UniProtKB/Swiss-Prot annotation:
Pfam families: Ribosomal_S17. The gene is rpsQ. Belongs to the universal ribosomal protein uS17 family. One of the primary rRNA binding proteins, it binds specifically to the 5'-end of 16S ribosomal RNA. Keywords: Ribonucleoprotein, Ribosomal protein, RNA-binding, rRNA-binding. The keyword Protein biosynthesis does not apply. This is Small ribosomal subunit protein uS17. Part of the 30S ribosomal subunit. It comes from Caulobacter vibrioides (strain NA1000 / CB15N).
Length: 79
């Protein structure tokens, strides 16, 4: 099964080698038929402490690195 890749915004970089990423998605409410925005926070491994709060990043699934971290940050694409 392929690993999932999500895009989000860093909301916290206070942990050592850890960032908290907020991922937003839109769904259609099953009863109201209205488009609703949902968000979820993921703890992701950032080996180099390279990302700061407010940056848009991509994360990929990985083997568990700790109790909360099962995602790691994809490296920045070089232009």
């Amino acid at each position: 099964m392929p690993k999932r890749i999500l895009e989000g915004v860093v909301v916290s970089d206070k942990g050592d080698k850890t960032v908290v990423v907020k991922v937003e998605r839109t769904i259609v409410h099953p009863v109201l038929k209205k488009i609703v925005r949902q968000s979820k926070k993921y703890h992701a491994h950032d080996e180099a402490n390279a990302y700061k709060a407010g940056e848009a990043i991509r994360i990929i699934e990985c083997a568990p690195k700790s109790k909360l971290k099962t995602w790691e940050v994809l490296p920045k694409a070089s232009a």
